[in-house]
Amino acid sequence: MHRFLVKLSSSSSPFSNQLRSLKNQRLILPLLPSSKPFTSSSVSPPPSPLNASNRFGYPYSADLFRNLSPLNPNSRILGVNGITSSRCISSEAVRESIEYDVLIVGAGPAGLSAAIRLKQLSQEKNIDLSVCVVEKGAEVGGHIISGNVFEPLALDELLPHWRQEHAPIEIPASSDKFWFLTKDRAFSLPSPFDNKGNYVISLSQLVRWLGGKAEELGTEIYPGFSASEVLFDASDKVVGIATKDMGISKDGSKKENFQPGVDIKGRVTLFAEGCRGSLSERIIKKYKLREEVNAQHQTYALGIKEVWEIDESKHNPGEVIHTLGWPLDPKTYGGSFLYHMNDRQVALGLVVALNYHNPFLNPYEEFQKLKHHPAIKGILEGGTVLQYGARTLNEGGFQSIPYPVFPGGAIIGCSAGFLNVPKIKGTHTAMKSGMLAAEAAFGALHEGLNMNTYWDNLRDSWVWKELYAARNYRPAFEYGLLPGLAISAMEHYVLKGKVPFTLKHGKADHEATDLARKWTPIVYPKPDGVLSFDVPTSLYRSNTNHDHDQPSHLRLRDPKIPEKVNFPEYAAPESRYCPARVYEYIEDEEGKPKLQINAQNCLHCKACDIKDPKQNIEWTVPEGGGGPAYSLM
């Protein structure tokens, strides 16, 4: 039987003392057999090149968290620094309620930076402050995926001595190359990037390190908990979140291992869920936060990435390559990246803007084509794929940032959308937003201020200046690749971002999808199993795992739309834009097409929630701990 070591939070509340006390006992739990990706024509994947220590199965989840609690159903407990917690009783099951000063939803760069800054202020001011971070992934960093050429500006401010504290930031960017690709050639262009002082990193590894720093300062971090609902008080103020119940079968009945979720409350709640956060989007709509500042709709891209181990002779640590052009058509914005990491590893990815028009376009297959370009193939040949993943990213920039403050908290990081598109960087801005929100939250709790100071300080920060200067880059490409390059070059090199106007985005991504009759189907080559691979093989490398016997977290608002609209009018685009083959059309008993949702394949990329032409798919959280288990991304 496979086994893994449960990592438990170094928390300081009596409620979690039982968890902490097990740290020295090396608690071992069984690892459930990993589920193979499911399709109607599923194939057996090859052996994973990752060693067993990189495989994660059933997480240390709500079952473990509650079963270790010493409380009886009628007890009240004293949380961190005097914050009370209580259990709420029903006739069916016990549902706990825990309270903190600050609750952070999501253990990514923004959420962990906020937690660290809060604890720093707590120590500086000698004021007790309880901070909790909940994370839907089985471990901190397990759902984190990014390029990533890291700009350390925010980290320098947050943890000035990180260079002496063994941060996983080791490979300085050594060179920048910018290529325009045709089918067979790569033309060098002047590089608009300046990565001097930046580092080629794995963001999932950096986030793990940040999680450790947050815990050292006293933050309670609970992975394996999916935040499924927002909690409000009688005045419609946000007071926390509810985690998803565990142990519910596909038909909605309670299984023998059923455990109710937990109500986790905060005097201030910060949402740091990443791009297209499910609860963040509800908050934005409920409080009309875009309308508050006349922000435009958000626009997105889908990033697909692999980490390869290549021959030593081809490895140039710190080399950074970006491309435009092939394999994408001139009307589709996007490009690829290839970053040389440490240990003979390279990060290769393709980013495709989700406002593409052709419903036959398949981002996953475009990525497979990319690897056969002579300039890319020459680097990869003889290498081995170590990991695969995908995630959407915000590309709306300055124009699309909503008012980030609501009654009871704020939205931070990529949930709000602080990516600098021409830089292809958002980690440093996400971290800074978390730090600014933390300072506002501390001021609101202990200095008589309010959370609006987050918005004020954000607009006075380098984040705002940086995004304002880059605001016209992405919408310039609404006019096509060449006009976009011309406009962005003029603004970048000549006008230095000081143009007197702001371009608007075009249609929302789902509205940009054309009817299938306007396009010719694209015939993609079959994978060769050496450079290009089928979806089940790639999924195996993502370590994705969900309990099959749970309700689908991918909900159809109208179950008839796939067969009556998407299939006949748009040629089933969900079967192509999803990089995990979650959506698959099969024949029913009468030989008619029927949508089958393979929810267990889901990489949590959120493309379906964004790109579905009729906005019929709603992405919600599955049981805590499900999804990918990235370790290199």
UniProtKB/Swiss-Prot annotation:
Organelle targeting sequence: 1-90
Gene Ontology terms, MF aspect: 4 iron, 4 sulfur cluster binding; electron-transferring-flavoprotein dehydrogenase activity; metal ion binding
Protein name: Electron transfer flavoprotein-ubiquinone oxidoreductase, mitochondrial
Localization per Swiss-Prot or TrEMBL: Mitochondrion inner membrane
Organism: Arabidopsis thaliana
Cofactor note as given: Binds 1 [4Fe-4S] cluster.
Binding residues annotated for FAD, in chain numbering: 102-116
GO cellular component, one term: mitochondrial inner membrane
Traits of the deletion mutant: Accelerated senescence and short siliques with reduced seed number.
